Amino acid sequence: MKIWLLVILLVGLPAVLFAQPDYIEVNAPGNRQLKLAVEPVLSPDGSSPPDASRNSSEVITNDINMSGVVMAEGRSLQPPAGNTSLSDVNYAPWLTAGFDMLVRSELSLQGDRLVVEFRLFDVVNRKMITAKRYLGVAKELRRFSHSFADEILRALTGEKGVFTTRIAYVSAQTGNKEIYVMDWDGYNPLPLTKNGSINLNPDFSPDGREIIFTSYKRRNPDLYRRPLSSPVEVLLSNSKGLNITGSWSPDGSKIALALSKDGDAEIYTIDKDGSRPTRLTIDPALDLYPSWSPDGKQIAFVSDRMGKPQLFVMKASGGDVRRLTTTGNYNVNPRWSPKGDKIAYSRMVNGAFQIFTISTDGTSDSQLTTEGSNENPAWSSDGRFICFSSVRSSGNGVYVMRADGSGQKNVSQTKGKYFQPVWSAH
């Protein structure tokens, strides 16, 4: 067995396996970047509400700034630019202050239930753009704020945001490699596995309700499936040897993975219940890391059939294999963009991994990271962002960046080692 494959068996770090729209136009050429003010949440009487609401404007501001679409700022005008009615806005002071849009929100209680109303206003044209009302408990306010940030992005671009989505990842913070899930911005981390073994390669189902992952809990790297809402784990594949790098098909009916039951690792598909294993690659080299195209017709994967690990693409049924990467000697971790036009991956550059994207015809290759060592890129469902694991002097963790490499941000809330983040679709 080749040395670089042995690493996953002993260490469990797969990244080193291989030696005219109905919305506001914000991107018109020549336009300056628009500015959005986000007021603090108020109670109906105009006073500041309980502590639970204090982070709401910060959540919305951070979400919108991460999008890069407009510049958001948590801001209140003194004296107030309007009265306590959400709809009664004095636009002139906001316009004078240089803002184009305004978010106002109000929090109240109905018995033991929290009622939050958000409104987005067009300051320049003096009108309301959109509004949303939420009913729940106090701990849901952060989620409500993310949800309204999604609606703001929909109003600005025509596409809903991904700020209510989650990221699954592997962490060794307990001494064992367990799988966790957190909000996209790193808040509310929760363990999904607690078996004290090595757990790797999480991947969300297309509906975001389940994950698949590989676990060594039975002393063999087997593939499991479990819902996020239940601790029940279903064994999908326990062939002798590797059952790793599972990837859910876009329609949720199949899973592509690497199996070594016939010798070297090869790409197979199985049905979502683990049945009907079908071999796709037939090559004496190692083939791993399958990633489906968004239309489900192709699969990208990694192979060292040319001597060094490179990215290849084939039909989802196998065959018509073509080499994608021609630059670099160590290219791994392919992830197909939801938009279908690019594949993100990791390349070894001067002894460290960096994140790249390449067009699906191989003609355009762009480096997105330069600091530290960066691995395991995964796209958000709208193709606007990429999450990845990073080891750098400014802090290790799960990072998020825009698809062009800008806005790199460590979203991990605790110190430790983080691996293999993957973004949910919902």
Which functions belong to the PLM regions below?
Residues 23-91, 103-109:
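Short beta-strand->alpha-helix linker/helix-N-cap micro-motif
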Residues 113-115, 175-180, 220-224, 264-268, ...:
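Structural motif
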Residues 162-163, 206-207, 250-251, 294-295, ...:
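Residue-level detector of Asp-centered blade-edge/turn motifs that repeat once per structural unit
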